Amino acid sequence: MQSTLSQSPGSRFSQYMALTKPRVTQLAVFCAVIGMFLATPGMVPWHVLIGGTIGIWLLAGAAFAINCLVEQKIDAMMRRTAWRPSARGEITTPQILLFSAVLGSAGAWTLYTFTNPLTMWLTIATFVGYAVVYTLLLKPMTPQNIVIGGASGAMPPALGWAAVTGAVPGDAWILVLIIFVWTPPHFWVLALYRRKDYENAGLPMLPVTHGEKFTRLHILLYTVILFAVTLMPFISGMSGVVYLASAVLLGAVFLAYAWKIYRDYSDELARKAFRYSIVYLSLLFAALLVDHYARPLLGV
């Protein structure tokens, strides 16, 4: 193994960045930023937009670093995660703890300084929900880990909304509900084609504990529920027809994937569905933003 002393600063930086799971963090922060814009009819104050974005990113990164630390032995047994620096022993436990503490402290200070105490405490609660409740308790103990633990991962829109208004109204909770319902089918399609990984690691993911057919059925059921839930922004009056059309179109494609997985499963199909689920959530929240500012202009 390459020693720490022989590594270039760029290589070391990349290793620490990998602990924050950049792609997952980017999606979470993106949803939080959308929540900021939806919270106001005008422009989000720059100090809130920048400070809130940085603060949420820092605390999210801290939570993911703790996740990597706790799961380093599990990650080492799984092909999908064996490359992580924590799994390879390239970063020590004290280093990860210090890194997470620095990120978390900086994130909390940034949110308190540039947004408000509510946003800081909600984000800290989200950190605890993911890094402690989900990672330490739910994930290794129950096949419903994704369903219950999805609550913490669904919080970013509420965090963004709170950063702007200092409150979390009903519309913000609708956005949270969308991500909450999206989470199980998103992760279950991954668990289907990575079943052996999870089985070897001893994690009670749904395909491992209840089998492939049961999981495929529940992916379909949750996707149907998701389709219905994504209509709520239009029904509540938060969004207009631009969003509605986007939600129906995007949801129809997701439903088609879920139906195909249920009727004629293949690992390749599950991989495509997993990739689409990420695109789906990104485009759905982008549609919320476009609709938010286009609606007054179009009058619909």
From Swiss-Prot:
MF-aspect GO terms: protoheme IX farnesyltransferase activity
**What is its subcellular localisation?**
Cell inner membrane
Q: Which GO terms describe its cellular component?
A: plasma membrane
Query: What Pfam families is this protein classified in?
Result: UbiA
What's its top-level EC category? transferase
> PROSITE patterns, alphabetically?
UBIA
Could you provide one GO biological process annotation from this protein's UniProt record?
A: heme O biosynthetic process
Q: What is its main location?
A: membrane
Q: Which InterPro entries match?
A: Protohaem_IX_farnesylTrfase, UbiA_prenyltransferase, UbiA_prenylTrfase_CS, UbiA_sf
The pathway it acts in is: Porphyrin-containing compound metabolism; heme O biosynthesis; heme O from protoheme: step 1/1
EC number(s)? 2.5.1.141
Catalytic activity, as annotated: heme b + (2E,6E)-farnesyl diphosphate + H2O = Fe(II)-heme o + diphosphate
**Function of the molecule:** Converts heme B (protoheme IX) to heme O by substitution of the vinyl group on carbon 2 of heme B porphyrin ring with a hydroxyethyl farnesyl side group.
Q: What else is known?
A: Carbon 2 of the heme B porphyrin ring is defined according to the Fischer nomenclature.
Q: What is the protein name stated in its UniProt record? A: Protoheme IX farnesyltransferase
Name the species this protein comes from: Burkholderia ambifaria (strain MC40-6)
> What lineage is on file?
Bacteria, Pseudomonadati, Pseudomonadota, Betaproteobacteria, Burkholderiales
